[in-house]
């Protein structure tokens, strides 16, 4: 479900943008919040019932590794929601979806 959502939302976006998706324990999407990758701040909102959180980052130039800002946003999410699984998904028209999992 999450890979399809990443493809639908982000693959055909041609500038860096990120999205935080909150998913419950039944794999239902609870919230979706898009924001500028460079200015995440308070935009990274996580639903209180989330069992898994996906941080999606669009890389229109085809970069397969996280941007430094992706890693900063990931660390900020970890601080907000300790103990919840966070999945980083990098998307782009040329690369499709690449998922990176991080242990809790």
What are these regions (language model features)?
Residues 4, 10-15, 26, 35-104:
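Active-site-proximal loop/helix of nucleotide/amide-processing enzymes and allied scaffolds
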Residues 17-20:
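Short glycine-rich loop/turn motifs
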Residues 29-30:
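Hydrophobic "anchor" residues
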